[in-house]
Amino acid sequence: MALAVPLPEQASRLLSWSYTGAGIAASGTFTTDDTPDSEGSYKITGIAGSRNGVAIISLETVGEAIPGNPGFSVDNLINASGRLTSHGFGFRTAAGNYANPFYADFRTPPGFLEVFTQPASTGFSELPIEFVAAIVPKS
């Protein structure tokens, strides 16, 4: 007789996030793993939201660069205090454009930047942003 054993529930956390800059307004939610890696960062596994009113439709694959920004792969990591890494996360919008917000620790002073690419027109920008993220309490 075989017994049915329920699969363990996938543990995850939900974070709300937003960033703004010159002509930029993006916000939404992240789903992350529930357990941090050895450096205290959580892997972003899902994304929802919009950038300048255009829906975000997918998260860029870890280890890949957004189209139009070769050599700068994303790691989709965020730490408990809401800081992104120097690789940041990447996403695609419904308009076919891509964004890669990240923490620019190489700048003086350090701060957040967004790389935005428009592959159809080879558009590219890299602008300072103010980024915030917070855990959404489980109900």
Predicted regions and their residues:
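Mature extracellular "passenger" or substrate-interacting domains of secreted, surface-exposed proteins
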Residues: 7-138
